Amino acid sequence: MSRLVSLLRRRGVVLPSFEIYGGVSGLVDYGPVGARIKRRVIESWIEHWGRITNVVEIDSPNITPESVLIASGHVGEFNDKMSECLACGSAFRSDHLVSDFHEAPDTLSSSELDELIEEEGIRCPSCDKVDWKEAMPMNLMFQTSIGAMGGSRTAFLRPETAQGMFMLFPALYRHFRQKLPFGAMQTGKGYRNEISPRQGMIRLREFNMAELEYFIDPDDP
């Protein structure tokens, strides 16, 4: 992976963001070559699905009101469990820390993760100490607000593009003259406040998405 990341960087495909100010993990820039590749991939994807007569393209906002994401379950359930090192303050995904000791670490509860970390004497990858806070859930969405001061509404940067298509379902249903099936596709940015982004571009805090939602009548698919 490190060799691939180094090659992409040298060739101007993908580079670390804000590097002259120390960089920010989980954020990348697309260089001259990477930007062209990305544009062509997106255009090809849209062209492919656009050939289907009952699939349309939409474009919805990156900022999503809290009420939408409460209804979708993201506010309560869009979490990863985090373990913080008391010695140096570094934070890591708990399931990543125990991945060598359990086949399905993402299924473990916070208490089970704590027990496994203690049993195996897992050391902090940053400082090599064994001194952990209890694992706790961390919501992965970036929170913001809409409006000024007292009149503001809680909102989030969207964790995925799907909600925009679901919100437009009534309008799309009218567009297709109240007939199913039909589909909506969307490309754009998604945002997830990853606890410990790593592995190059596999876990990013801001990333490109391409999604298609296809709506059918379950009684007459």
Question: In which residue ranges do the predicted regions lie?
Answer:
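TRNA-recognition modules of translation machinery and tRNA-sensing kinases, especially anticodon-binding
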Residues: 1-221
